[in-house]
């Protein structure tokens, strides 16, 4: 996870900005696009005093194996070889040779090259609503979505959960090089009445990639935390 985004999430946690779980439910964090599981471990350790579970999803077989090994000795961390989408139980495909490459950039490129959205390796998709439906007794308090282009689909599969739990969300988009996808993600967040704050920090490739933190517009405390963070960042940059 990028430095500034991590600092902002730690500030939100330190200032008690995450929603409290609903009565008789377990508070949860979703790390979707978990890669090798290192960010999921960081989240578990940072959130330990809140007794939150971290559910890490990673579609690539090799990455999921590494993440699963990392999780063996970490309490409250659960790893699944799954992708996120808008239809629970659907199947996605990719060339098997991607499992021989550590970098997730190949999946990111594949989102925009139709010929790479097929292959002899596959993974199942689930939805946020399926993972956090009422029968699970879970409350989603934070979702970190690093889905290499799949953020919009994940948000479309989260309507009930976003309405019920109002979690903090982080998403990654490319406002210039992948403008249509960026606008779609922003429109979905607006439809759920989320205010979006953009972290001025380059992520991934192409170089216009940015992280965004979205918080429920009605949550004044969260908005104050983020307004303060970005005001301080601007003051530090001023000559």
Question: What do these predicted ranges mean?
Answer:
Residues 1-239:
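Phosphate/nucleotide-binding beta-alpha loop and adjacent structural elements of enzyme active sites
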